[in-house]
Amino acid sequence: KINIHFKKKNYFKVIKKSETLLKNNSNQHIIYNYIGLSYVELNNLDSARKIFLKAIENDNLHASIFCNLGIVHKNLFLFSEAEKNFKKALELNRNHIQSLINLGHLKSSLNHTKEAEIFYQRAYLINKSEEILTYVILNHFANSKFSAAKKIIEEFKYKFPNNTKVDHFFSRVHNYKNDNGHLNEMLEKTNNKNLSPEDNSNLYFAIAKAYSDQNQIKESAEFIIKANETKFQTFEKYDFLNEENQFKQMKEYFKNFNFNKSYQSDNEDKLIFVVGLPRSGTTLLHQIIGAHSNVFAADESVILEGVFNTKFKNTTAIKQFFNLEPIDSKIKSDLYNLIKQNYKMHHPNKIVLDKMPFNFKWIGFIKIFFPNAKIIHCNRNVQDTALSIYKNLFEGPTMAWTNSPYYLTKYIHLYQDLMNFWKNKLG
């Protein structure tokens, strides 16, 4: 019954019934998992963490418990603890596939892609599922192992011919200038009436790229438009007002903020942030600066945005942060230490280079916590940037604005306005 409630997303019922069962017998790791995962689904990570820790205290030393605790710690941006949990799970069961995958994810998020490859490959040898093949391919991309990626892609295409994500993967590493084979396969797939909008959008982006390689501009443009229109259909609940509110609130919070009273770090801010719009040249600059022997190129680190979004889940939390004058030093030091500790997991000694473009939204916080960090703003011709964004596939509901010319234009205006605000505020 608990399993049925969980599948139906009746998470409060799962918690209530499971807690009753635990009163009779506390040595049931499956029950702890149901409770903890229900709290995760309810976005109550602190309660989930307490449940998994309680399970361990009651000698439920099972790989799944440590794995799920690791997932919670990762979502709380306690990366060091998460790594310990995943490794403990693998000590208990070296073939625990979810621990292998999640340890791979953790290493990948730190841009330790060679280490990530080890764990993804171990998972791949156990289960060559669509999910795991996808992770292996993406990690090969990150390591610039395009030949190896192509080999896995061919295996993927053979095993799962109806999966169109692999067609898009293939288009990223293939030049169609003198090759119509795969292009014809994709055009044939578009006749399949059973494909979802998500499936079709993958195909359309890949076909547009193929036509672009062949310099068939008209055909490429037609499929770019179809790809974006179809992709945008998949975001039924998208509300651009959320974007507008975030930009507006950021300006409101910092409008009268006195940076001279901000928390002073230990003057060891070995951080460089490259910010701007996607497709604005951040990758090229990342490669140039990252080539220096004293710099660790962290790629697009999730740390800054992740920590702030986790700690400031709602407007009440962020208002409390700014309403204290001066801001409580313990709150600042705790946040500072959490962010700094995670950046040091990229590399403990080198200067960490973070090219997450959207960190432009957090420049005010960067100046509070890391006043000595370097911030480099990439500012490419806005029309070229907009076209490049529109031509490329971005995943996730927060990127829905990239699939609509109207919202894309509005987002760029919001970005320009916020960057002007930071420039006037910080000089």
What is the role of each PLM region?
Residues 3, 33-41, 64-75, 98-108, ...:
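Conserved alpha-helical positions within TPR/SEL1-like repeat arrays
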Residues 157, 295-298, 302-325, 346-427:
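PAPS-dependent sulfotransferase catalytic domain
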Residues 24, 58, 92, 125-126, ...:
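Structural marker of alpha-solenoid helical repeat scaffolds
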Residues 28, 62, 96, 129-130, ...:
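Residue-level recognition of tetratricopeptide repeat
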Residues 217-333:
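PAPS-dependent sulfotransferase catalytic core
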